[in-house]
């Protein structure tokens, strides 16, 4: 079984940024999450706090993230991670049909929002 340098669980801004940084620094990467990236990101009407990209909307930023992943040839594995095991010098990453290995794991699952107001979940971004 081939061992990746870093497994990243989550394809929101933090997970994508970690994957890009790792790849640029010559590390092998396993990126787990949705190919559609973060639904919170894609629903955002306007993002004003992302460095270098003032007034971009979430869908545009998600497309820029996808393009950057494509250029660096970082695939997204949509298999659900069901468990992570510390194995001493490495980690075992369990999916429904495979056990993968990585020297390091980054959990970038985002945040769980509180109970939304009526219809808020459709408007969040």
List where the protein language model places each region.
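Flexible, glycine-rich phosphate/dinucleotide-binding loops
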Residues: 15, 38, 56, 114-115
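Glycine-rich, flexible loop/turn motifs
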Residues: 37, 43-52, 113, 119-120
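FAD-binding core/adjacent interface of flavoenzyme oxidoreductases
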Residues: 1-7, 25, 76-125
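Glycine-rich FAD pyrophosphate-binding loop
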Residues: 7, 24-43
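Gly/Ala-rich phosphate-binding loop of Rossmann-like dinucleotide-binding domains
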Residues: 19, 23
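N-terminal Rossmann-like dinucleotide/flavin-binding domain of flavoprotein oxidoreductases
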Residues: 42-99
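Glycine-rich Rossmann-fold phosphate-binding loop(s) that bind the pyrophosphate
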Residues: 9-14
């Amino acid at each position: 079984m081939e061992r990746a340098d870093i497994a990243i669980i989550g394809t929101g801004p933090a997970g994508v940024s970690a994957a890009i940084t790792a790849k640029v620094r010559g590390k092998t990467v396993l990126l787990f999450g949705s190919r559609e990236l973060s639904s919170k990101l894609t629903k955002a009407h306007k993002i004003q706090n992302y460095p270098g990209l003032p007034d971009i909307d979430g869908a545009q930023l998600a497309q820029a993230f996808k393009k950057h992943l494509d250029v660096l040839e970082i695939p997204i594995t949509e298999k659900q991670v069901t468990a992570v095991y510390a194995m001493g010098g490495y980690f075992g990453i369990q999916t429904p049909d495979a056990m993968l290995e990585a020297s390091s794991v980054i959990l970038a699952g985002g945040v769980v929002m509180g109970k939304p107001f009526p219809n808020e979940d459709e408007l969040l971004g």
